[in-house]
Design a protein with these regions (language model features):
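Glycine-rich phosphate-binding loop of actin/hexokinase-like ATP-binding domains
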Residues: 1-51
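ATP-binding/phosphotransfer module of carbohydrate and carboxylate kinases, centering on a glycine-rich
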Residues: 32-166
């Protein structure tokens, strides 16, 4: 999810991945966009992490206001796509997911999806030769199918699974 923060989960074989701690996708470190006025981001823990560069508060700091009022072609969204695409690229080469689902308040701006998909492919530089990724990117990097109640369904399923395992 991309909203006031950035959260991510990894599901393998129907089970969420949990090792030393839960995946902290939001704190992966990224390269700054050359036109970013806040290249270190707003995270109090890490300079240049995904959450500090791409969550809602970072977008607001970048435009010094409420980004919800901006037009889709505002340059801030190319910067946003640059950071989200780095996350996608990192996940593709490390986790090799079958699908990347991007939800949350920031991702309600549907114009971001084409920008993120295009930038992800550019960043991969032809390294990953997958038909699913190269020719069906619209079905690979997607919004949640159950939006706006996807979070509720996820919580329900986690609770149900916990009860079954108790």
């Amino acid at each position: 999810t991309v909203g006031t923060g950035i959260g991510g989960g990894v599901v393998v074989g129907g089970h969420t991945v949990h090792g030393l701690l839960h995946p902290e996708v939001g704190h992966m470190l990224l390269r700054p966009h050359p036109d970013d006025p806040i290249p270190h981001g707003v995270c109090p823990y890490h300079d240049g992490c995904l959450e500090g560069l791409a969550a809602g508060p970072a977008i607001g700091a970048r435009v010094q206001g409420d980004a919800r009022e901006l037009p889709d072609d505002h340059p801030v969204f190319k910067i946003e796509a640059h950071y989200l695409a780095q996350m996608c690229q990192n996940l593709i080469v490390t986790v090799s997911p079958e699908k990347i689902i991007l939800g949350g308040g920031v991702m309600q701006r549907e114009g971001l999806f084409p920008l993120v998909r295009q930038e992800t492919l550019r960043l991969l530089g032809g390294y990953v030769q997958s038909d699913r990724l190269l020719n069906h990117t619209d079905d690979y990097i997607v919004p949640p199918a159950l939006y706006p109640v996807s979070g509720l369904w996820g919580a329900y399923l986690l609770g149900k699974k916990a009860l079954e395992n108790a």
